[in-house]
C-alpha cells in the first residue's frame, strides 16, 4: 500500500503524469487507473481509521510506512490544490500518531525519522501546531535511541554493529528529518545535531572507493550507488542541507563527491 512499493507510489506516479502530460493520447486510460488506485488508497485510510486498535506491526516511515500515505496525500494537494487531500492527510495522520510511540525502525524509510518529515510537511501546509508538536516530541524520543560515536552521532539499527550511512537507513535519512525541524523552528539545537550527524557520516567516505562505505558488509569494503544506500541518497540529503547551510564547505565537497560517484564510468 505504501509509497515505496505499493498503491501510494502508483497514485503519485499517475498524478504527476496527468499533471505533466495534459494532451497525452492515453490520458483517458491513465485517468481510469488513477481513479481506481485513489479509491483503493482512500478505502485503506477509512479502514484504518475505523479500527479502534491499530494492528501491529505497522511501520511509520515516509516511504515504507503509514507516513508515506500522509505524504502522498499532501503532494496531491500541492499538485491539484484540492482541499480534500489535506483532509485525507490529516485523517491518516491520526493513524500515524498512534504508532509513533511504538516505532522500533527509527529510520527514514520505515521509521520515525520519516514520520517527522511527514508531520512537518503537514504543519507547513496547514499551520496547525499539533503536527509540529508531534514532530518535536517524536524527535526527543528518537534522539535518546541514538548513540554518540567517537566522531559524531548515529543510530544502530536492528542486528547492526554500527550506524549506517545513506538515505534509507543511515544518517542521511535522519538528516532529512532534522533539516525539516530546523527549517520550521530555527531551533539551534537541531542545527547542532545536524552537524553531529554529518560528522559521523563523512568519516564513512572512502577516498579509495570514491563512495560512502556500506557498513552492512562485515568487511567494510562494500559500497552502493543506489537511492537507498550510497552516493545518490546522500546527494539528496546534502542538497536539502544547502537550504540552511548554503556556504558550508563540507556540504559543497560532499555534493561534488556524490555527483562524481553517481556518474562514475559514464562516457
Language model segments and positions:
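Glycan-recognition and catalytic cores of secretory/periplasmic carbohydrate-active enzymes
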Residues: 1-267
Amino acid at each position: 500500500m505504501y509509497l515505496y512499493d505499493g498503491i501510494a507510489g502508483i497514485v503519485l506516479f499517475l498524478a504527476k503524469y496527468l499533471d505533466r502530460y495534459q494532451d497525452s493520447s492515453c490520458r483517458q486510460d491513465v485517468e481510469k487507473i488513477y481513479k481506481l488506485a485513489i479509491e483503493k488508497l482512500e478505502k485503506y485510510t477509512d479502514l484504518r481509521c475505523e479500527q479502534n486498535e491499530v494492528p501491529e506491526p505497522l511501520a511509520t516511515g515516509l516511504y515504507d510506512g503509514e507516513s508515506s500515505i500522509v505524504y502522498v496525500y499532501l503532494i496531491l494537494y500541492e499538485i491539484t490544490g484540492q482541499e480534500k487531500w489535506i483532509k485525507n492527510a490529516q485523517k491518516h495522520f491520526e493513524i500515524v500518531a498512534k504508532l509513533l510511540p511504538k516505532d522500533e525502525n527509527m529510520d527514514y524509510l520505515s521509521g520515525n525519522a520519516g514520520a517527522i518529515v511527514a508531520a512537518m510537511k503537514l504543519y507547513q501546509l496547514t499551520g496547525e501546531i499539533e503536527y509540529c508538536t508531534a514532530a518535536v516530541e517524536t524527535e526527543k524520543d528518537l534522539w535518546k535511541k541514538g548513540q554518540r560515536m567517537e566522531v559524531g552521532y548515529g543510530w544502530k539499527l536492528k542486528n547492526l554493529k554500527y550506524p549506517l550511512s545513506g538515505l534509507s537507513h543511515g544518517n542521511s535519512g535522519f538528516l532529512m528529518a532534522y533539516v525539516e525541524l530546523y527549517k520550521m523552528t530555527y531551533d539551534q539545537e537541531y542545527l547542532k545535531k545536524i552537524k553531529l550527524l554529518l560528522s559521523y557520516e563523512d568519516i564513512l567516505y572512502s577516498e579509495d572507493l570514491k563512495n560512502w562505505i556500506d557498513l552492512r558488509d562485515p568487511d567494510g569494503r562494500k559500497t552502493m550507488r543506489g537511492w537507498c544506500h550510497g552516493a545518490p541518497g546522500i546527494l539528496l540529503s546534502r542538497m536539502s542541507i544547502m537550504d540552511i547551510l548554503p556556504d558550508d564547505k563540507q556540504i559543497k565537497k560532499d555534493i561534488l563527491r556524490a555527483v562524481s560517484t553517481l556518474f562514475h564510468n559514464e562516457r
